[in-house]
């Protein structure tokens, strides 16, 4: 009999815990309405950015409160009494929101039983993260969202992840192609702007090597190792001695490292971040050095996907980006990753404006996915630049873009930065090696590379 009574007491106690947990979840409210009564709505006519933002909100609410809110498409479901509306939908609240935002700004509005989040392209990810961090807590709460349009900027935290995006051959006018060409590229977002211009901090970089106008080997080595070197050398200084790369520095700091490119892994730029060789065409030497990097440093080298169709850009390339980031983020100390779009350079060598534009749009797609990651992981610094300009591209007398060379030039290239410390690059024209110096400084090394003439920014 005593055993039965004890068992009943245990079951009663367990039931009380379950009921308390249920009460805990049910007592979470937004503007006085139970969070459990809301559905999350996304636009099936909008870009995938909005769908992924809606998924993120759903997942975070489940993780934080135990509530599994329904995720529904805008056009296929009637209006619910209480909704969290993500992106540009046909819901009345979306039309009411319709805010004028600039750069990385996003808008939030509460109206009646609905809440709406709105932003351009990938910036909706920043809105989703802000919404969850601000209004979805892990305890009993009653959050209040203003019933008037509020404009916000993304949350930024101290950086522990570093992403360097390189558009090979991408000069200033390559990023301006959207002003001259119609974007009917099938795998694009229909965008009319290079995504770097959404970032708040812009500057320029000088690209000369010790040989004069740089090639991709010396240009890549400058960005990877913080040394000016001789054309053709991979990860080596002017005396042909191996020099430390940011990828290797990451390993020293206990971080993960990765190298990605649409070029093959023995291409000059990915090689500069993953190998040491006395010639950019020494493929056997480069492959052996990269094998050592994988074995010694655990460097992820994922290269060689030159696709120009919706199917492959939206699945293969974007999946590779997602998978690589997922592997790198497993390191609790953070990571360094370089990603290169290699084919802007190749098409500019051939003076093929349309194919170069397709490569720029493809680079934009990669930038969008990386920026999504940054917004969901605000402890990430990101910088977009080029190793050099190719083709001497600028408008002719009739206002049309025109090539004036088939080779590399000494033209300055753009720098776009976002995240903790990114303001150091704003409005400045820097040497390419200073980009490496400054990222290394952020990673905790103030003596990285050759700083005899130029140092990290902020010193």
Task: Indicate residue ranges for each PLM-predicted region.
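Functional beta-strand-loop-alpha-helix junction segments that form "active/interaction loops"
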Residues: 68-72, 237, 306-322
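Solvent-exposed alpha-helical segments and adjacent loops
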Residues: 21-154
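Positively charged n-region of N-terminal signal peptides that target proteins for export
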Residues: 1-4
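N-terminal catalytic scaffold of extracellular/periplasmic and nuclease hydrolases
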Residues: 147, 153-305, 309, 364, ...
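Extracytoplasmic/secreted envelope proteins and their assembly/folding machinery
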Residues: 51-58, 125-129, 220, 244-247, ...
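Active-site His/acidic residue clusters
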Residues: 267-275, 308, 312, 321-325, ...
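Active-site neighborhood of phospho(di)ester-bond hydrolases with catalytic His/Asp-centered motifs
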Residues: 383-386
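Hydrophobic core
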Residues: 9-13, 17
């Amino acid at each position: 009999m005593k055993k039965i009574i004890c068992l009943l007491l245990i079951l009663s106690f367990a039931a009380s815990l379950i009921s308390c947990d249920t009460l805990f979840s049910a007592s979470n409210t937004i503007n006085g309405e139970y969070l459990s009564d809301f559905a999350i709505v996304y636009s099936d006519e909008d870009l995938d950015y909005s769908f992924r933002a809606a998924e993120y909100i759903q997942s975070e609410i489940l993780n934080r409160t135990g509530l599994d809110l329904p995720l529904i498409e805008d056009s296929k479901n009637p209006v619910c009494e209480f909704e969290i509306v993500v992106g540009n939908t046909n819901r009345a609240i979306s039309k009411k929101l319709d805010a004028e935002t600039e750069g990385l700004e996003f808008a939030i509005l509460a109206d009646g039983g609905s809440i709406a989040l709105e932003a351009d392209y990938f910036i909706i990810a920043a809105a989703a993260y802000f919404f969850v961090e601000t209004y979805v807590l892990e305890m009993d709460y009653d959050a209040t969202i203003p019933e008037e349009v509020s404009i916000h900027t993304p949350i930024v935290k101290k950086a522990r992840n570093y992403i360097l995006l390189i558009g090979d051959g991408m000069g200033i006018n390559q990023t301006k192609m959207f002003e001259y060409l119609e974007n009917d590229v099938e795998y694009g977002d229909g965008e009319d702007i290079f995504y770097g211009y959404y970032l708040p901090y812009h500057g320029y970089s000088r690209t000369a090597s010790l040989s004069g106008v740089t090639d991709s080997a010396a240009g890549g080595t400058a960005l990877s190792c913080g040394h000016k070197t001789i054309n053709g050398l991979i990860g080596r200084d002017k005396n042909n001695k191996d020099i430390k790369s940011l990828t290797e520095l990451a390993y020293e700091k206990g971080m993960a490292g990765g190298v990605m490119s649409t070029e093959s892994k023995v291409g000059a730029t990915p090689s500069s971040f993953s190998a040491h060789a006395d010639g950019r065409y020494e493929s056997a030497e480069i492959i052996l050095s990269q094998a050592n990097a994988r074995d010694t440093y655990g460097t992820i080298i994922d290269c060689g996907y030159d696709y120009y169709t919706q199917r492959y850009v939206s699945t293969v390339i974007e999946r590779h980006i997602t998978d690589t980031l997922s592997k790198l983020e497993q390191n609790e100390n953070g990571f360094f990753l370089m990603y290169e779009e290699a084919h802007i350079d190749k098409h500019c060598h051939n003076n093929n404006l349309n194919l170069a534009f397709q490569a720029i749009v493809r680079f934009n797609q990669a930038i969008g996915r990386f920026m999504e990651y940054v917004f969901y992981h605000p402890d990430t610094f990101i910088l977009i630049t080029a190793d050099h300009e190719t083709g001497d591209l600028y408008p002719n007398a009739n206002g049309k873009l025109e090539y004036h060379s088939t080779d590399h030039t000494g033209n300055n290239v753009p720098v776009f930065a976002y995240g903790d410390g990114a303001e150091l690059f704003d409005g400045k024209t820097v040497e390419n090696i200073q980009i490496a110096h400054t990222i290394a400084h952020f990673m905790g090394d103030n003596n990285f590379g050759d700083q005899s003439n130029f140092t990290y920014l902020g010193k």
